[in-house]
């Protein structure tokens, strides 16, 4: 992750946390994700947690729980709603379980490439999606990033959704 992206990420997270309520004693927060400790999502989460603690003079102490240590992606999404987890890294397919419209970003062949997806994330349409998600769930989306696309492998080549007609495939629990 580029330095500016890291800084923007930490600032967004810090601003959201600081705006969350009146001054008080240190708050301990749980940040969960499903990625292994060698993955950039984990290393940047640890970095952001340290930056947030530093920039808020210790007001927020965030412990990062990697590698599904607090549950699978479905579990940590439910944990956000239940209040057992404070922050997560998750994808639109899981958010769509609570607010189906936001799942559009997960459909195959919706975006031409990563730049197209990032342009969507800065659009009024995406703002409408995250506002609707927040109204429905009470959960605020702080940042959006491109981590690559899912891939489908088969013995038959296809370049669009029509080419997948009739294929029997296994899919993750999304």
What are these regions (language model features)?
Residues 30-47, 67-72:
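Extracytoplasmic "Venus flytrap"
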Residues 65-78, 157-159, 172-174:
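Short helix-initiation/N-cap motifs at beta->coil->alpha
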Residues 47-62:
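Signal peptide-proximal N-terminal region
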Residues 18-25:
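Sec/Tat signal peptide C-region and signal peptidase I cleavage site
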Residues 1-11:
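Bacterial N-terminal signal peptides that target proteins for export
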Residues 49-50, 86, 91-174:
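Contiguous mixed-secondary-structure segments that line small-molecule binding/active-site clefts
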Residues 57-61, 76-90, 168-170:
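Alpha-to-beta junction loops
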Residues 62-64, 141:
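Generic structural signal for residues in well-ordered beta-strands
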């Amino acid at each position: 992750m580029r330095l500016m992206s890291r800084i923007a990420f930490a600032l967004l997270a810090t601003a959201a946390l600081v705006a969350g309520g009146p001054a008080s004693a240190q708050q301990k927060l749980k940040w969960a994700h499903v990625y292994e400790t060698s993955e950039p999502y984990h290393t940047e989460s640890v970095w952001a947690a340290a930056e947030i603690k530093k920039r808020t003079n210790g007001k927020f102490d965030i412990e990062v729980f990697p590698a599904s240590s607090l549950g699978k992606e479905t579990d940590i999404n439910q944990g956000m709603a239940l209040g057992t987890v404070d922050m997560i890294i998750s994808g639109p397919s899981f958010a769509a379980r609570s607010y189906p419209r936001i799942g559009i970003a997960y459909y195959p062949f919706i975006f031409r490439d990563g730049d197209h997806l990032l342009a969507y994330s800065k659009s009024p349409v995406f703002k409408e999606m995250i506002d609707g998600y927040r109204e429905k769930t009470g959960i605020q989306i702080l940042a959006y990033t491109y981590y690559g696309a899912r891939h489908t492998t088969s013995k038959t080549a296809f370049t669009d959704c029509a080419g997948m007609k009739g294929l029997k495939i296994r899919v993750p629990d999304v």
